[in-house]
């Protein structure tokens, strides 16, 4: 592996940590706090994850089109901003319905800059060890979920779920900075 390959792999690890690690694998830590705050069942809040994942799948269908028709960096910048802002905006939702709407937006945006884009980057930069590189990058979804879930739980306990969503929105965007700023 060359230095450039390692750099691309690190970028992909950050991208997967942001999209799958934060969007999906650590989402459950919010369910009880949000449900109690809104006076609804946890199932109503967990539906946000289902909606996000469905929108993620749809967004992934548009990845190649956007990357082909637009500048790569601008696409990543645009959709990582949308993802970060929509995640932070979950903290100001007055009820669960608005969380559903934001879940569509954040799911779609991460779909565009998520798994499909990561595999495209790996396939474009690696001529050998493609499977290994893909496995390492995708492994960061679980690593991020395992590390961030207790961190987010602690954050929710200390600052409340609303402020935690703002912090997570910022983190979601920050994890995309290596992709935006590096010469990938």
What do the predicted segments below correspond to?
Residues 16, 80, 84-87, 102-103, ...:
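A generic transmembrane-helix signature of 12-TM secondary carrier transporters
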Residues 7-47, 59-63, 148-149:
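Extracytoplasmic
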Residues 52-57, 142-144:
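Short hydrophobic/small-residue motifs within alpha-helical transmembrane segments
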């Amino acid at each position: 592996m060359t230095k450039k390959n390692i750099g691309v792999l690190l970028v992909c690890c950050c991208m997967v940590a942001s999209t799958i690690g934060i969007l999906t694998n650590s989402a459950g830590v919010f369910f009880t706090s949000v449900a109690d705050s809104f006076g609804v069942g946890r199932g109503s809040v967990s539906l946000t994850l289902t909606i996000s994942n469905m929108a993620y799948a749809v967004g992934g269908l548009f990845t190649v089109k956007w990357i082909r028709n637009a500048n790569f960096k601008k696409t990543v910048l645009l959709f990582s901003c949308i993802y970060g802002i929509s995640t932070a905006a979950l903290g100001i939702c007055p009820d669960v319905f608005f969380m559903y709407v934001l879940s569509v937006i954040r799911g779609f945006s991460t779909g565009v800059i998520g798994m499909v884009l990561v595999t495209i980057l790996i396939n474009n930069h690696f001529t050998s060890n493609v499977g290994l590189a893909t496995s390492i990058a995708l492994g960061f979804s679980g690593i991020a979920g395992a590390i961030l879930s207790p961190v987010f739980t602690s954050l929710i306990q200390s600052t409340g779920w609303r402020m935690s969503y703002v912090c997570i929105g910022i983190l979601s965007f920050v994890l995309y900075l290596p992709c935006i700023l590096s010469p990938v």
